Amino acid sequence: MPIGTPSVPYRLPGSQFERWVDIYTRLGAERILFLGQEVTDGVANSLVAQMLYLDSEDSTKPIYLYINSPGGSVTAGLAIYDTMKYVKSDVVTICVGLAASMGAFLLSAGTKNKRLALPHSRIMIHQPLGGTSQRQASDIEIEAKEILRIKDMLNRSMAEMTGQPFEKIEKDTDRDYFLSAKEAKDYGLIDKVISHPNEA
C-alpha cells in the first residue's frame, strides 16, 4: 500500500498560524528540490518551474537538487539541464541513492565544486536508449540519426563536465557503467562525497 506524500506543519512568513503542507512544498520554501523518480515531461516541467521561481525570488542563494532517479526521457532531462545552466543561482546537486542515466547527467551538471553524493550512492552512465516498433524504414533511419546526434552531444557535455577525454566517455557509456560515490568523484562526475549537511 502506498504511503502517500507526508504533510508537515508550516507557518507562512508574517502569519501567526501554522498550516499543513506536503513535505515537498515545505522543502521547496527552503530552496530544496527533489528528483526522486523517472525523468518525464511532467517531472521536468515541475522542476523547471520551481527553479525559475526560486531564481527569480533570489538568484544569490543556491538551489539544492537532490537526485534519486533511474533516469528517463532525454528530452525532458535536457529541459532540466538547460534550465540549470540558464538560472543565475548556483545549483547544488546531491545524489541520494541512485543517479542513473539522465539522473547521472543531471547530477554532473550541477555547479562546479557543488556536485555531491552521499557515501553509499550509486551512479550509472550509459548511452541514450532508443527504440522502434513496426515503423517504416525511413522513419527508423531518421530516428537512428537523431539518437546518434544526441549521444554525441551528451558525451561531449559529459566530457566537459567531468574533464575526461571524449573517447573515454564514449567507451564508458557504450554499456551500463556503474560507479560508487568515491569512484564518481575520481571520475569527475561529482566533486565531493559528503556524510553531513554542513558539508554541502
UniProtKB/Swiss-Prot annotation:
- Cited Gene3D superfamilies: 2-enoyl-CoA Hydratase, Chain A, domain 1
Q: Which reaction does it catalyse?
A: Hydrolysis of proteins to small peptides in the presence of ATP and magnesium. alpha-casein is the usual test substrate. In the absence of ATP, only oligopeptides shorter than five residues are hydrolyzed (such as succinyl-Leu-Tyr-|-NHMec, and Leu-Tyr-Leu-|-Tyr-Trp, in which cleavage of the -Tyr-|-Leu- and -Tyr-|-Trp bonds also occurs)
Instruction: Kindly list the biological process annotations in GO that this record carries.
Output: protein quality control for misfolded or incompletely synthesized proteins
UniProt main location, coarse: cytoplasm
- Which PROSITE patterns does this entry report, sorted A to Z? CLP_PROTEASE_HIS, CLP_PROTEASE_SER
Supply the enzyme class, top level. Answer: hydrolase
Could you tell me the superkingdom of the organism this chain comes from?
Answer: Bacteria
Could you tell me the EC number(s) of this protein? 3.4.21.92
Q: Cross-referenced InterPro entries, in alphabetical order?
A: ClpP (IPR001907), ClpP/crotonase-like_dom_sf (IPR029045), ClpP/TepA (IPR023562), ClpP_His_AS (IPR033135), ClpP_Ser_AS (IPR018215)
Annotated localization: Cytoplasm
An annotated Gene Ontology molecular function = serine-type endopeptidase activity
Q: Which family does it belong to?
A: Belongs to the peptidase S14 family.
* Assembly and oligomerization: Fourteen ClpP subunits assemble into 2 heptameric rings which stack back to back to give a disk-like structure with a central cavity, resembling the structure of eukaryotic proteasomes.
Q: What is this protein called?
A: ATP-dependent Clp protease proteolytic subunit 2
Name of the gene encoding the protein in the UniProt record: clpP2
